[in-house]
Amino acid sequence: MKDIEIAQQVTPEPITAIAAKAGLTVDQIDQYGSTKAKLKLPLPVKKTQRNLILVTSINPTPAGEGKSTVTIGLGDALTKIGKSTMIALREPSLGPVMGMKGGATGGGYSQVIPMEDINLHFTGDMHALTAANNTLAALIDNHIQQGNQLGIDQRRIQWKRALDINDRALRHTVIGLGGATSGVPREDGFDITVASELMAILCLSENIADLKQRVNRIVIGYTHDRQPVTVADLNVGGAITLLLKDALRPNLVQTLAHTPALVHGGPFANIAHGCNSVLATQAGLNLADYTVTEAGFGADLGGQKFMDINVPAVGQAPNAVVIVATIRALKLHGGVALQDLATENVAALKAGAANLGHHIHAMQRYGVPVVVAINEFTADTDAEIHAVKDYCADLGVDAVLADVWGRGGDGATDLAAAVVDLCAQPSHFQPLSPADADLKTKINDIVTKTYGGANVEYSAKAQRQLRTFAKQGWDHLPVCMAKTQYSLSDDPKRLGAPTGFTINVREFVPKLGAGFIVALTGNVLTMPGLPKHPAALDMDISDDGKISGLF
């Protein structure tokens, strides 16, 4: 059966019953229908063991390696072995849902439901973020039209408009055409909503007051004498914040096995920081003994950003890290073509295992215990599975087979037991770089220690920006690397575990509201495009309202 067909066969429990499982009363949630709710703020606090499990992965194939599916299956498995558990996930963007992925709520018997609602409009968070982003853009252009009291240089506005769909035609636009009453003409562009700074701010804010402070710190552009202009200067921070007041609150849903799940926030890990909201993670820690969360793409992207950006905001490091690997991805890294990944090839798998080894070492560098989850696919052979287990054993790390797509939590009880054992071990977390290190030092540490590269080259523009940041006092902020997810390098075709490569930083984007500086590398884009055959072509809805084609 297809994912959506499996999900449609399960009758969800009332969201009030799911809330009760999590220790929440009806007065502590606002219901969005019978199967969704938002938590009220401030978050409730129970006495729990506060074990935090981070799920990350190796560099993926274009289809993804099932990290969300493993996260959900692991959460169900922990519940099955008697542990108080909460799952925290990012919410899907319509861009990949309609584009390449077709959905982002897990798969098979490890899904969060109602999957149709979550994949589409859910509780409206994405639309609120899009509206807030574009309201700010409109207010900026209106300020310029109405006399430009702040002296904003329209050539140096860095705030773009946003849309929650992949639309390459909107990457570069010209606005303000049509005469004097239609605004001041200038170049503009669109980012996908999940790349908006407001998404990062939403995911890192602790409460409304923190949200408003962060919104006010946003740098929207520069004056003619190159001084930064902020939202506070425009005096619109309150208006933007009130548009996000409900989006700030975590969303409560359930898995197919009725484990409570918080699905909130959705920044991509290749062009943003790739973690669900701090409030959702904190809610899980406050309500359950074990909170399972994921970070986008591989340990080089979401994993690194979780450790260096999210951990300080959450206030707790992971007690254990699960690295998801698949036989097919390891063979891809070993040189096998995409169309041949279903054919047994132990030699190629062993060659590609270096990518897994690199991610293991990258996560161990933070001082936290690691286990590998082999996400099982039907084409995997015993010889290939044993080869991965042997490789990991040589590194002193357990590799546990998990069939979460086919069996749900039942297929991950061994993984759950391994995670419980890891959480009982001491964790000695340490960040990759000192907090007071400058941007170049932090970038060099990420490139050499996490990616395995040798050098960093900066474009002339990036070098000018670094000098500006130093003058503004921004040169000690955390850095958020925007990089391809397919390779440890900035070249998506350079697979495996390359060494000696150079990362090319072409431009920086200061995101003071989020509290970090984005470094754009290679050819990474903040507005993706749709593939030749977008998933939307296979979607439909029947006359009686039954949805098909989501997965």
UniProtKB/Swiss-Prot annotation:
Pathway: One-carbon metabolism; tetrahydrofolate interconversion. It holds the Pfam family FTHFS. It catalyses: (6S)-5,6,7,8-tetrahydrofolate + formate + ATP = (6R)-10-formyltetrahydrofolate + ADP + phosphate. Its EC number is 6.3.4.3. InterPro entries: Formate_THF_ligase, Formate_THF_ligase_CS, P-loop_NTPase. One of its GO terms (biological process) is tetrahydrofolate interconversion. SUPFAM superfamilies: P-loop containing nucleoside triphosphate hydrolases. ATP binds at T61, P62, A63, G64, E65, G66, K67, S68. GO terms for molecular function: ATP binding; formate-tetrahydrofolate ligase activity. The keyword Cell cycle does not apply. Keywords: ATP-binding, Ligase, Nucleotide-binding, One-carbon metabolism. It comes from the Bacteria. Belongs to the formate--tetrahydrofolate ligase family. This is Formate--tetrahydrofolate ligase. It comes from Lactiplantibacillus plantarum (strain ATCC BAA-793 / NCIMB 8826 / WCFS1).
